[in-house]
Amino acid sequence: MKSKHFRLLWLGQLFANLGDVLYIVGLISILYAAKESAFYLAMLPFLNTFGRFAGGLLFPILLNRYRLTSLLAGSQCYKTVVLFILILWISFQPPSIVWPIFICIWIIAFLDGWAAPAMNALVPRLVKREELVKANSFVAVIYETTQLGGWAFGGLLTVIFHGEHIIWLTFVLFVISSIMMKGIVDETSLKAKRKKCGKRDEIKEGWLLIWNNRFMRSIHIVIVLETAASVVWVAAILYVFVSEVLHVTEAFWGYINAAFFTGLMAGGLCCLKFAFCMERHMRKIVISVSIGISIMTIWFGLNSITWIALILVAFSGFLEQVKRIIINTYIQTEASLEDLPKIYSAQHALISLIFGLFVLMFGAIAEYVSVKMVFIGAGFLLAIAALYMTVHFPAHFKKGAPPYS
């Protein structure tokens, strides 16, 4: 936790995450001013989701040719360059021509598809094994703090400045992040890389590592179910729920968002405080919180009282963060350091794909059936995940040798 390189990692990620939030805020402002169309705004999450999916899919090819630290720093540096090109286009071209903006958005999302697995895979290389829960909790708290603070700060900036100025601020944050990422050194001694194989085999490697290990396969089945269920918290569905079920103005969506992120932060702080205790009882805790999230989600869908909705959302965020940290720590503990980036690459590609598909599916259910049914359906998906985890989640962690040969 006190390692200089871990400090550079989380500081670099802090500036990158804050920049990512302000980048989205600035783009929303620019696109809406140019087109005043919900369709163009909807292109933002679509391009982000499938750009990250493509980046995660191709990450293993790069992993066999470059060091993990080089990929993380390179991703951030290239994002900074593409963002500068985007700023030049916005500054000197008519705002009505948006297709170059969409190309830049996709490229930045593609580069993010490298950064996410690289970041997660570097944590166990830069901290001691017994500090993993604490390190993951700390990184989670930093992320949620920048998300909560970034959206609030971004909303304030849009009132004062034009979207173009917000993008310039993002550029400055990206430059600072790039400098810090370049300073990270991974001193881990790894096994020699295996002999070269075809690009298709390289892409499949992480997927096969997950599928061929029983515990990893079980964990990722749960991740798929819970990713599908998490779609209910996107703005498009919450807006409808706030209007049709809670019968309050759309501004209440902001309170729900704040309550959820507050719960996430509280969950991260709780894991940070009680890391040692949690590491000894991971199985019991992760099963209990999974059941709790399922109950909270169904209850939220059936509830129509505003203050109860805020409490349920905050508790859901708290439990969700605890579960994420435990599952992430389990994966980092069980996989070898050589295999971990490939596993995270496949995982992030899978999450992006599932999330993108279920956004469309749940959006259609909210439109043509009932937004309440969306939350009830998500709750049942979470219940299935909790039941599956009760049977398949390992009772203990392996010590010593990694599970992959």
State each model region's role:
Residues 27, 114-127, 322-335:
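Intracellular juxtamembrane helix-capping segments at the cytosolic ends
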Residues 14, 97-114, 308-322:
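Hydrophobic core of transmembrane alpha-helices in multi-pass small-molecule transporters
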Residues 1-6, 186-221:
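Juxtamembrane intracellular "pre-TM" segments in multi-pass secondary transporters
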Residues 121, 125, 167, 171-197, ...:
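Helix-loop junctions on the cytosolic side of multi-pass membrane transporters
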Residues 42-48, 54-65, 69-71, 75-81, ...:
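C-terminal transmembrane bundle of multi-pass solute transporters/carriers
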Residues 28-34, 87-92, 149-169, 244-245, ...:
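Transmembrane alpha-helix termini and helix-breaking/packing motifs in multi-pass membrane transporters
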Residues 161-168, 208-266:
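A single, central transmembrane helix in multi-pass transporters
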Residues 105-145:
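Cytoplasmic helix-loop-helix junction between adjacent transmembrane helices
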